[in-house]
Amino acid sequence: MPSIKIRENEPFEIAIRRFKRACEKAGVLSEVRRREYYEKPTEERKRKAAAAIKRHLKKLSRERFALQNLRKGRPQQ
């Protein structure tokens, strides 16, 4: 669980904002949402496999786009 130390003369709103940022960075909310309901091991494997395929296709798409731009002589973005 993320924790912060409240600085001297620090407004409460700013401390809350820092705490929220720390929680987001640690992935607390996404972990809570993931654990809200039980997920069967087979469903978890399917979800992870689908995510891996999606990442792979996204990477291929980016590479193809970059290759097309190189062939056309356009600078990369």
UniProtKB/Swiss-Prot annotation:
PROSITE patterns: RIBOSOMAL_S21
GO cellular component, one term: ribosome
Molecular function terms, GO-annotated: structural constituent of ribosome
Domain of life: Bacteria
Pfam family of the protein (one): Ribosomal_S21
Keyword list, A-Z: Ribonucleoprotein, Ribosomal protein
PANTHER family cross-referenced by the UniProt entry: MITOCHONDRIAL 28S RIBOSOMAL PROTEIN S21, SMALL RIBOSOMAL SUBUNIT PROTEIN BS21
Entry similarity comment: Belongs to the bacterial ribosomal protein bS21 family.
Name by which UniProt lists this protein: Small ribosomal subunit protein bS21
